[in-house]
Amino acid sequence: MCIRDRPGAVKVKVLLAQALFGNPDILLLDEPTNHLDLDAISWLEEFLINFENTVIVVSHDRYFLNKVCTNIADMDYGKIQLYAGNYDFWYESSQLIVRQMKEANKKKEEKIKELQEFIQRFSANASKSKQATSRKRALEKIQLDEIRPSSRKYPYIDFRPEREIGNDVLFVEGISKTIDGVKVLDNISFTVNHDDKIAFVGGNELAKTTMFKILAGELEPDEGSYKWGVTTSQSYFPKDNTTIFDTDELIVDWLTQYSEIKDATYVRGFLGRMLFAGEDGVKKMRVLSGGEKVRVLLSRMMIMGSNVLMFDEPTDHLDMESITALNNGMIKFPGVILFACRDHQVVQTTANRIIEFLPNGSMIDKITTYDEYLESDEMARKRQVYSMSEDDENDN
C-alpha cells in the first residue's frame, strides 16, 4: 500500500522516522503530534527529552510543550518574544506582563487626571501659577505604555443542558463488531453513571470510533445491545465530518435546523461565540477550513442543549486558544461526557473514568484520572495479560 493511502497516524510516523533518521543537528517539527495516539505522543516526548541536539517545534498540545520545551518563542503583537521555560511558565509570564502594563497605565491615568484637575483649577491663580506650570511639565512627561491587541482570539464554549440528567444514563451489554474481518469490539459491556466523564483511550483508534458510531445510532453492532436512559439527550462530534460538510447549504441555515428557536439572529449568536463574525454565517458549508468545521460542530452541540456529549477527537484542527476554551467548557459541563482525545491535558483535566480499548477488541474500565491510570501498576499488569492472550490467539 502506498503512503498516500495510509491513515494519518501512519503518515506522521513515517515523516517522524524520516526526520529523526541520522541524528540531525537541528530538528524542525511542525505539529508532530497530529494524528498520533497518546501512547505514540508519550514515546515522542521521551525521545525529544533525551535528544541532545536542537529542537524547534510548533504544537497545539500544551502538555507536550510543557514536557519537551526549555524555551518558548511567543509570536504575538507583530513580534517574537523569547521566554526561558516551558509553556506554563510562558503563559503565566506573558499574562503577568500584560497585567503589570495595565496596572501601570491605570496609575498613570489616575496621575494624569489629578494633574489636569490641578492645572484647570489653579492655572489662572497668580499665587499657584508656578505650581500649575510645574504640573504641566510633569503631565507632558507621562507616557502611557502601548498595549497592542493580541492576535489570539478565544472562542466562548459553554455547553448548557436544557434538561437535568437522571440516574439511568447508558447501559452497554455484550457489544461486538467485526470490520473487514477484524474484531474491533469483543463483548464490550459497561454502565454509564450520571456524573461520569469517560475518556476512551488506547491505540485502537478504530475501536473507539466504532463504539461512538454505534452509540450515536450510525452503526449496528453484530452482537449485543445498548440503551440510553429516558432523561438523556445526546450530541455527537464525529471524527470524520466529510459527509456533513459536503453541501452548499449556508452555515446559519444548517445550524438552524438543530435549534428549537428558528431565528437567524439567535443562531448567529452561537456562531459569534465561535469567532464567526459578520458575513461568515452565510458561508457555504463545503468551503470551510478544518478549524472552521470543528467550530461549527461545536456550535451545533451548544445549540442543541444535550445532557450527554460524545466527542471523537474534537481537538484536531483547533488552535491552542480554541483547545483551551473547549477544555474549559468540558470541565464545566454538568452532564455526562464520553470522549476520545489526543490532547493529554484535556484528558487529564476532564476525565474521572478511563476506558481503554485494547488491540484484541476487549477493554479495561477504571474510575480514575488519566495520569493515575498511566502510573498504575495494576493497569500495566492488565494490559500485559491482554497482550499475552492476544499473542497466544495469533500463535494458534
In which residue ranges do the predicted regions lie?
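Intracellular alpha-helical coupling/juxtamembrane segments of multi-pass membrane proteins
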Residues: S93-E146
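Short, flexible cytosolic linker that couples an ABC transmembrane/permease module to its adjacent nucleotide-binding
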Residues: R148-E164
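Short, polar/charged, Gly/Pro-enriched helix-capping and turn/loop motifs at alpha-helix termini
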Residues: A104, A126-S129, E146-P149, K153, ...
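ABC ATP-binding cassette signature C-motif
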Residues: R4-N105, F159-N396
